[in-house]
Amino acid sequence: MHRRWLSGLRFEQAVQHVVLEDLIAAVEAATERRDRLTRQIEAVLPEWSLASVAQALQALRGVALVNAVTLVAELGDITRFASPRQLMAYLGLVPSEQSSGQSRRQGGITKAGNGAARRMLIEAAWSYRFPARVSRDLLLRQEGLPQPVRATAWKAQLRLCRRYRRLAHAGKPATVVTTAIARELAGFVWAIAHQRARHAA
């Protein structure tokens, strides 16, 4: 649909049309590469020892195949974190702190730890700006998953959508809101990974 609309654009100078066509070709090449890599991930996923965790994480809104696989590949065995707070700290999603004597000041997030996994959570967090609902794609991703995992994912969606609206309504910048949502989302990732570990045992 977008391609058709772009093809219909007319420019005063021919060089502008050449540049547009070049940009369209670059987007199409990137899309084909993404699709090819996604198919390869789908093909090897069943053989992976952490596949069940990656599949379970897809129950969360904003966490599709590539996002889930990246999170699990970057974090490894998520059950090694004793608490959600440890995972949040590892991801650099906790506030920095400067303390001196009796004064204590918190700043922005530390950005310590795994940047790739943190980016995946922040990307996923943007989807919580919309009202809570189970889309057709999300329903397909949740098919066959245990009820406790689906219940946790729905609880996450209700809480995070509400929190996103509340923070945005309070006038917080979008990046601050999204980072706060990503931090809480990490807690739900931790919970689902632990549910899968108990289910597998």
Residue ranges and their predicted role:
Residues 1-201:
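A detector of single, family-specific signature residues
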